[in-house]
Amino acid sequence: MDFYIKKEEVVKSLNATLGVVEKRQTLPILANVLFEVDESSLRLTATDLESEISTISTIANFKSGGKTTAPAKKLSELCRLFSDDSEIHFFLDGDNLRIETDSGKYNLATLPSEDFPVFEKEEAENSINITAQNLKSLISKTAFAMGN
């Protein structure tokens, strides 16, 4: 796995997945985010075994694909420190995820992607299409019925 991505892309994706990353995990892998890289995109996936969030970002420069996991919180904190216009170079070096920018070089320990629990995707028998605006309106009209 070897690719470049703009800071804003990876930070946006990491922030979206952090909400589901376990703070007090029973399995160490649940503190990690799954990286899946192909020619044009980076998919980040996080789970707490009840919920799963997956994001897709466009990569700037692809060298090789692959999968790994890395600590979500550490990675997010590190990426936020980089300058806003940074292009971040991610690549695997043995059991480490190497991260390079113009401001420095960093290593994060990884866990095998095979250990990451992924939900089975189910195809819906029936589906509807709804605009985000209509969905937001429907949720706001029923929010009073939710428990605290």
Predicted regions and their residues:
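Structural preference for solvent-exposed beta-strand-turn elements
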Residues: M1-N148
